[in-house]
Amino acid sequence: MSSRADREKEAQKKWNRYLVAVLIVIIICVVSYVNFVEPFIERTEDQCRKDGVVSIETAFIIDATDHFSESQAERINLEVKDIIESAEIDERFTVYVLDNKFSEANSKNPHIIVCNPGDGQGKSEFTNNIRRLNKNWDEKFYSQITSTIENLVGEGRANQSPILEMIEFASINTMSKSKAKSKRMILISDMLHHNKEYSHYTSSHDFEEFK
């Protein structure tokens, strides 16, 4: 009788150990899954996060009133591509264009605004469609910016080039409103301001007056 009770106790102990082992495995699997699978991030059509998170705020100002040589345009396009390819995930890019329509009200609005959703690098192939992520990155982010700038950097000509006004406008409407911890403004211009109030091409105006 005692032997039978001992056997039953031993069997119960084994069963308890088995349950504990199974429970440990389940806990490990759950923890691994939570750490392995990234939370889903909702994005708008411009690939920016719906929760408003922006890692870096970057503003391009393209002076389309400038005349760039073929070699200068090629250098600019290569530099822009390097910047875009090294962009951080959730970095937001706003492209402003300064052209001969600057005096018109809507000409100061951004040409495009788009965020970097990531190209799939560093993500697991088991939980992500890397090819789809890369295609989305190329079509909705990379090509959006590079093609825009390639089309704008060329044979621009205009009677005015109010670059300082555009810098001020971008600073107020993009930089000051952004909650990003890091911000930068990238200018593609000869930086020669020219309008009736002030011109770098002449010395007849007082810069302090313009300010």
Describe each region flagged by the PLM.
Residues 75-82, 168, 206-211:
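N-terminal post-signal-peptidase region of extra-cytosolic proteins
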Residues 63-64, 170, 182-196:
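DG-centered beta-turn motif at the end of beta-strands
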Residues 192-211:
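VWA/integrin I-like adhesion module and closely mimicked acidic/polar interface patches used
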Residues 49-52, 84-87, 173-179:
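Surface-exposed acidic, glycine-flexible loop patches that form ligand/cofactor-binding
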Residues 53-180, 184-186:
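Von Willebrand factor
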Residues 2-73, 85:
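Acidic, polar low-complexity linker/tail segments
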